[in-house]
Amino acid sequence: MRHKYSTRALVLARIPAGEESITASLLTEDFGLIRARSQGARKGSAKMSAGMQTLSESDVTLLRGKDIWRMAGAVLETNWARELDAAARKRAARVLELADRLIRGEHADPELFLILTSFLRALPERTEDEQDAAEMLAVLRMLHALGVDAGDTYGEPDDYSSGSEKSALARAIEDRSALIARINHGITESGL
């Protein structure tokens, strides 16, 4: 009998696999980025389908197979696609898509998970300019955590504060051009 692992996960992407199954790209708190197969997740009556939607934060139960992880359960914690307005949803999708492309291999990196979950939690409470700055900070911090940027990350991984001129978002708004240049350089260095 295989051991079951439970962890929190962000669903970065999902790809159809067969008639009713999916392979989900999950950024997990305990195992890093993994690909997991969910049998029957595309059925309308599937219990796990809500917890396996792109832009969902879920508590998942996983089984380690010979070649791939398998989903044994998924309980939806937050469906960010429903919580965010259209503009914020596009920002979140861009950041999670980039994370899916940049993060390689299975290794625990709680900082990456914290960066992205904090970013998602901050979006509904921010103005459009602050959301733009939060998107830049999330990408910059992700690049820093992956080792392709060594500059200032404008605070802690979960700091998307606003309100004062010294806040992370205010500083990012002020330094927008420099941040975009650093992000573009980091993406180039990553080899994408």
Please identify what each model-predicted range represents.
Residues 1-192:
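Non-catalytic alpha-helical scaffolds and adjoining flexible linkers that form interface surfaces
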